[in-house]
Amino acid sequence: MGRKWNNIKEKKASKDANTSRVYAKFGREIYVAARQGEPDPELNQSLKFVVERAKTYNVPRAIIDRAIDKAKGGDEENFDELRYEGFGPNGSMVIVDTLTNNVNRTASEVRAAFGKNGGNMGVSGSVAYMFDATAVIGVNEMSADDVLELMMEHDLDVRDVIEEDETVIVYAEPEAFHAVQTAFKAAGVEEFAVAELTMLPQNEVSLDDASQEQFEKLIDVLEDLEDVRQVYHNVEM
């Protein structure tokens, strides 16, 4: 599958270690998910997913509860979920998912990030067809064999099970996300190392050193934008 999930999380964690950026982004996602349905994770699958994902990034419970409480109140801040697609150095492919209360601002900032870092915006669908929507769930307490057996016991047809360092990663269809988590919880798993709904590239590309440096700067700039939720790409890191 090509993604080193622990490496990706460590990079993000180190970048956000001394800031509240990651908390603010999750607070916004949780608020929007709670507004779109019941403000109870057990009754709202979208909210449950965001909360589970937030836990893997060590978002404090107080931040999660505050966002849900805000959604319960009369505050009605409207957000749009928008996806942008584009190209980085040497034809590399990038997808940017955003959550914004100002579409014009977000479009301008994303376009500028591409343009100033060796890339350019594409039209809708220009790169997404080269990615597959995928649920990615990782645990530390079980072996790959035990996970495979667990998936079979619960009659879950997953795409792949891969051991990475001390983490076992399950790749599945997006709609199987909660079923896979439920199976793990039934087996006694309380914490997840990875809990993502992501876009995985069908093929990854390698860049020369100069292009790689420029590409990584592009990704950093995009991820630093306030309205950006997730950035997906097809470059080996």
Curated annotation (Swiss-Prot):
Coiled coil segments of this chain: none
GO cellular component, one term: cytosol
Gene Ontology molecular function, alphabetical: DNA binding
Subcellular location: Cytoplasm
Predominant location category: cytoplasm
Key words, A-Z: Cytoplasm, DNA-binding, Transcription, Transcription regulation
A Gene Ontology BP annotation from the UniProt entry: regulation of DNA-templated transcription
Family note: Belongs to the TACO1 family. YeeN subfamily.
PANTHER family to which the protein is assigned, alphabetical: TRANSLATIONAL ACTIVATOR OF CYTOCHROME C OXIDASE 1 (PTHR12532:SF0)
Protein name per UniProt: Probable transcriptional regulatory protein EAT1b_0153
